[in-house]
Every structure is written in structure tokens, then in C-alpha cells.
Amino acid sequence: MQKHLPLAVMVLCCSTTMFAQNTTSQQPNKPTDENVFTFTEAQLGEDDNMTQNVTILNSATNAYASEVGYLFSPMRFRYRAFNQKYNEIYINGAPVNDVERGQFSFSSVGGLNQVTRNVDFSLPFESNNYGMTGMAGSNNYNFRSGSMAVGHRFSLAAANRNYTLRGMYTYNSGFNAKGWAFSGNLTYRWANRGYVEGTFYNALSYFVGVQKLLGNHSLSFATWGNPTERGTQGAATQESFWLANNYLYNPYWGYQNGKRRNSRVVTDFAPSALLTWDWAINNKSKLTTTLLGKYSIYKSTKLNYNNADNPQPDYYKVLPSNFYDVWGNILRFQTPQALADWKTAYEWLSSSKAHRQIDWDRLYEANRGASAQGADAMYYVQARHNNNLYLTLASTLTKNLTEKSTWNLGFNVAGNKGFHYQTMDDMLGATSFHNVNNYAIGTFAKNSDAVQYDLNHPNALVGKGDKFGYDYNINVLRTNLWTNYAETFGILHYSLAAKVGYDGMNRDGKMRNGLFANNSFGKSKTANFLSGGFKFAGSVDMSNGSVLSLGVGYEAKTPNAYVAFQAPEMNNDFVKDLKNELIFSSELSYQFSTSWLHANLSGYYSRVNNATEWTCFYFDDINSFSYNSLTKLNKVYYGVELGMKFKLTSFLDLKALGTISEAKNISNAHVRYLNSTQGTYNDDEAIVKGIRENGTPLTAANLGLSFHQAGWFIDVNGNYYDRIYLGYSPYYRYASALKAIGATDAKGNYIVSPQDKGKGGFMLDASIGKSIRLKKGTLSFNLMVTNLLNNQKIITGGYEQSRSDYSIKTDGTTSDRTYRFSKNPKLYHVYGTNGMLQVAYRF
């Protein structure tokens, strides 16, 4: 076993040195424990409280960045609270971030731990040989067969997390005498019931690769995928957690014929393949070209209803606080009858688990009754599909100009076609359903064209597997040209990077929506954007182990197609005033290294102007979906990071890490929204200044001990988290809505509810392992336990409900509700004590 603790190695291996050029090696890596490269569920983006993926980042020389990605992953930690779209991911030099949403789906490589171990990381101001580094850093995964650790490896693991069993086999041949290298990986992960009741997990991961050396050329081919089906977890209010006496109450499942059934099932598969040509032109120049393609298939089901009561078991109208004012300031909701109704609701929901879950049998019975009367399904399971066909070509020329200077020049071009549609997954015993906008009936006559989802096929009958509601494609073309230069002379090192790019995008509607008959079917106009930016980084070696570094950058970044369309499910319109984001980033760092201490202290400041955000939510007041775009939004990110690692003895290390950061809006925004029942646009101001980034702790700290000797390792980490904000509702903060309820002071300033914040706290994690050298191979045992103290009060994320505390009367006046949405955000609590036991044999 290696001398250093595997958990410390987990985020250190295969990293770049500070400001150093990364080069792709075709020599097999030294064997390292597989645990080191296991992505957590949060890192894979398979936790259901995540609107954004966590950032998987690393550095060989930064004591803070080398640890936090894994250590803080139970809290869905994002580096500097940046959106993961600013963390740019490559495979063999080809960009693989989702072109529409901007984020990379790590679930597409889930289970391929022995493949993803071969990776180069670049912090925001480190140079690399695959592109200008993103604001949140960049990763380049090396999928060449000849670069993988030679040998066989088999492992079995048992866990009580998203999956309960995992088996993995890996084989890498290394190069034979004829210059061939072969590799393969097969992993199966399974859970009949995951950590959260009602969830399940079923995934089979595969990787096949081959590489051939041809003189000073090399050709590499690889194909991989991770077909996954999993039942998901829903957020809930504190009232629901209290009723269930369970911080992990999951409203997404219920009993059908006595068996558990989940209403929100995700099916995810992104088969991918690449071909890489490496050409060592001479001993100073190298050309790398990669052609990569993938077809992503993503399907997510949801229980819905039609002219019926909401079937969700945690719907606010069935909760006790909907009958009695528990907040204590509206007397007409505190009558004896209201209290009796509260008790009735409480006794019903607390008396049986089945009463707190979906009653599937009742839904089937209701549909059979509707069918007998010739009516459409009252309840059904719909499936939202978001598929993408992606093809990219990337090429990089690397030239070592001198022993101390390197120049890179590269380009990439990518095309993406996104297929977005909705299908009928299960009619729950009903016999008919029509492709009609029932939300619009009432605003428009039942026989009006306006209520048709597709005027090309009016009143179409919908059966299992048929499309309904919406069907459209998003087409994106992206090109990028970049270069960087790095040089060292004496005690100074500096690097320069620049890029310029083009993005074009349009929508191609496949249904003629009745509310937008002339602006929904066929292709929209194409929006064109020019982008570009530059970065400078410099460092000074001040001797005695001290290095001072400075980095600055500026970029004009194209908005993602995901936020570019106002109501893509309804029409071809782009968001009004859609512009490039303007990004300024800077960092000042100090590093100190001796034989007994490695320390980093960094301060950073980044600003994003012209940000665009897009949301869609159900607007209960008018029984409508609301499509919201926020533009002209400015954001700021700044903070301090500290990482220290002390070598107490040859076998014992002490580490201390921490960050105090800020990530918030520094302006209000223009909001435009469209309600699905009306088909008209509304413009307003969103009072969102001061709103913070959500779903990640803005304050986090760690103190850990690492023991490693004679094949044993023991690691104990105490982590503290605070300032975990929830996703905010723009609707709460519309200027018009605030005026309607008189939320202004004497000077006319708006009185805005503070953003909801989750409870932080302390978590204790530990791991122990042993590596045994055999006559043939190595046998290792690892036990990792998270949240040893079972502190489930910590909130990992959640969101405000986009509904008001008042209803709107027909005369336009408002009336208070008993239930307070502003007091009841939907939350996710951290998992309690959970762990994994693994046995691995390498030979």
C-alpha cells in the first residue's frame, strides 16, 4: 500500500503542478487503490436535491483544492459556489459539457472508477494543454488504453447509500510487443431499496478501449456508457418530516397492491465513443486530435392529474396547518372548528405510513370510474424526455519552444441536437386521454383552437408511449479557437491564455401550439453570439518554500440554450434582451511548503454581469404553469480559502481546511413571464438583490487526522457546514406582487422576505483500510463511514415554494390563506450514518 492515506490521494492523483503544462503520458500509471477514484452520489449528480452538479476539482499543490471536493461532497459542495457550467470537462482533449445546460453529467461515467482515475486537473488560473481554463477550473480525462494501470482488478462492495451492492471488474493489458493496448471495465450497482425509502437503483457501467502505436503516431478508440434506472427522492416541508417522524420522508412513492411504487423514476443512458489521434511530430511538438460523439437518453416520470384533486400525499391542502393557523396571527383561522380539523388531519396522517404516501389503488379506481363515463384519465404518469445527439472535433498542437516555455494552439467545433418531448408513460387503468391544454380551458372556450397543444392534430387521442403536451428540438452549433503560452525564468513563472468562439442556436417545434399558432411549429430564427476572453497568471518563488501567485481574467460567455428560450414548451420566442455574460475573475494566493507543512491561503473575487436565469413553476393561484426569465442580473463571488497539512510523524498527518465565501446577486433583475393559460407576456422587476447562491455551504471547515503505516490507513474527519441557502422563488419578489400586498415602506422601498436558509452543523466521517501483498497481487479491505454521529438535522438543500400566502379574488383584491407557503420551504436533510465496505483484489 502506498505511504499516503488513500482519502488524501483521492483528489491528488494525476494532477497538474501549479502553472505547469500537462502532457498526456502513454505509460501505465502506478497502481492506486480504487477507492481513490470513486465518485460520490452527489458528484455523479444522482442526488435529487441538486439543481446543479457539484464541482469535481483538484490540484497537486493546493492543500485546500486537493481535499474539499470529496470531503464536502455529502453537502453537495460546489467550488466557490460557482455553477458547474463554469467547470469545463474534457475527455482526451474534447469538450463534453452539455451544450444546452452547460454542465457535465458525471453520471455518464459513473462506475468507471479505474477509467476516470486518469485525469489532469487545472485550477482557474493554472495552464493546461486542452483549453483556456474555466472560472471554476477544468478537468481532462485520459481514456487512452495504454495510460491505464496494467492488470486485472476485481472488487465487491456493500453499502447503505443510493445503492447497496456493487461489483466491478477491470482489465488493462498495457502495450504488447506489437504496440497494442486493450482495456475493459464492467460495473454493476444495485439496490432494491436505497437509503431513502421508496428509492431503488439499477446501473450497469461498461468501458471498452483499444490503442495502437504506429511509430510516432497513436490511434485510440474507446466506447462507454452507464445505463441507469433509479427511483428518486422528493423534498418535503418540516411539517411533513414531523408527521412522519423521519427526516428522510419521501412523498414520491406509495403502495400499489401492497408493493412500493415510485412515481419519479429516472432512466439515463449516454452511450459515447471517441477516436483519438496522437502525433509526436518531433521531440518538441505534438498534435492531438479527437472526434467524440454521444447520444444522451434521459427520461423522468411524474404523476399528474386532470380535472381531479392533487394526488401528492404532501399536498398542502391535506396538511394540518392548512386548517388551523399555527403561526398565530390570523384569528379567523384559529376557531374551535379549525382546531378540530387540524386534529383530524394530524391523526389521519400520523396514524399510518400508507396515509402519508401515494394511494395508487385509489387512482386506478378513480380512472376506472372516469372510463366508465367516457371521460379522460383523471390521473396518469407522464414522462419528460431530454435527449441529445452530440458530435465534436477537437485538435491541439503543443510545442515546447524552449526548455522553459510551452505554447498550445487548439480548436474545437461541436454540433448538438436536443430532443425534448413528453410522453404518456402509464394511464393508470384509464382508456382515453386527449392532447388538450386543460389548464387553458376556462380562460378559453373548450372548443377554441387556443386549448390545442397541436393544431396539426387537434384533439388527438393519447395512448401509452404517445407524445403530448410539447415536442421540440434545440439545435446548437459551437466553435472555439484558443491558445496559451507559459514560461518560467528564474524565480518567475507566468502564463497567458485567450480564446474566441461562436455559438448559434435555434428551436424547431414539432407541435403547433394553439396559443401560438404562428410561432410554435417549425424552426425559429437563429440567435448568434460571439464569445471570447483572456487570462493571465503569474507566480514568484520567494525561496524557502514560499510562492506568491496572482491571476486575472475576463470573458464574454454565451448564454446556454437552456436559458435562451422564454417558453420552449410553447413557442419559438427567445428571452428578451438575451446577451453574453461578462465575467471578471481574480485570485491572489500564497503557498508555503516544507518537509513538515504544506499550506495554501487564497483570496478570490469574481463578478458576472448580464446573467440570465430561467425557471418554470406551477402557479397555483391561476392553475397555470409560469415560464420565467430573469435578465440583466449581476452577481459577485468572493471569499477566502485556507488549507494546511501538517506531517506530525512519518505515519501521521493533520490537516485543516476551510472557506468563508460570499456568492450573491448585487442587482435586481428584469423578469418576463408567460402563463400557460393565457399566452401573453408580462414584464416586471424582480427584487432579488442580495439573494445568495443555493444548494451549497458558503462556510465550510474540516479538521482531520490521517494514519498510514504497514499497509493500514485510518482517516478521521470532522466537518462543519453553515450558510446553506435554499433556492429562491422569483414570484415572491415581483415588484407588482409586493405592491399588491403593501410590502413597501414609507419611502417606497420594497419589503422583501429574506431568503430561506437551511440549518448547518457538524458531521464526523471516518475510514479504515488494510492492504495485504500476496504472492500474486494485492488484497485490500476498506470501510468508509459518513456521518458517524447520525446528525440528520443538517439541511443539504431545498427551495421556496412558488405560491403566495394569499389568494386573489375575482375583483382583484387579496385574501390571506391559512397555509403559509412562505413559512414552508421544501427541504432535503442530510443522510444519517451511512457507509461502504469494499474488498478488492488486484493481480
What function would you assign to each model-found segment?
Residues A158-A191, Y195-Q233, S263-K284, A537:
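Transmembrane beta-barrel wall of Gram-negative outer-membrane proteins
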Residues Y249-S272, T276, S524-G533, D541, ...:
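Outer-membrane beta-barrel signature, preferentially recognizing the C-terminal barrel domain
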Residues L57, A63-E67, A94-F125, N142-R144, ...:
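Short acidic/polar hinge/loop motifs at secondary-structure boundaries
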